[in-house]
Amino acid sequence: MNEEHQKSIEEEITLIKRENLKLKNDMEEMIITNERKIDEMISEFIKVIDSFDKSETVVKEKGLDQEETSQKAIKRMLQPKKVAATILDKYDVHKIDILGKPINEDICTIVETEPDLEQEDGIVISIEKDGYTRGNRLIRRAEVVVIKN
């Protein structure tokens, strides 16, 4: 094999390696983009669950769930919420479990503080808006109330 042919082969190998690296980078970027789109869709889906939660709270606060007929109707109306929760679980989406635990500001936003001398500072005492993760990625931060003395 002559030197010129050897050089041509080496250049071709270098070109193929460069193209391979570009394809690999493009593929990784597409995966990241798709994951972000899925996260955005899940975030919108979570808003539907929030709406059910708010409605359920209002019904209970107004005492509209006292009669047996009302309870049955409410149970039927909340069935889509259960379906939605099952779908979220299928995609490894879970509520952040932070109630009664020390605040983790990487996954929570403090929306209010309350004094309580019987508890230590930074303990989450109320969740105003549930936070969610998908796998080990944060989808939505929890909005919480914590102790501050």
Residue ranges and their predicted role:
Residues 106-115, 134:
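Sensory/regulatory domains in signal-transduction proteins
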Residues 119-149:
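A hydrophobic membrane-anchoring alpha-helix module
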Residues 1-13, 131, 135-138, 142:
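Short N-terminal secondary-structure initiator segments
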Residues 63-65, 117, 131:
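Disordered, low-complexity tails and leader-like regions
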Residues 2-103:
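Charge-dense, E/K-rich amphipathic alpha-helical interfaces
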Residues 98, 114, 129:
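Thr-Gly-centered strand-to-loop micro-motif
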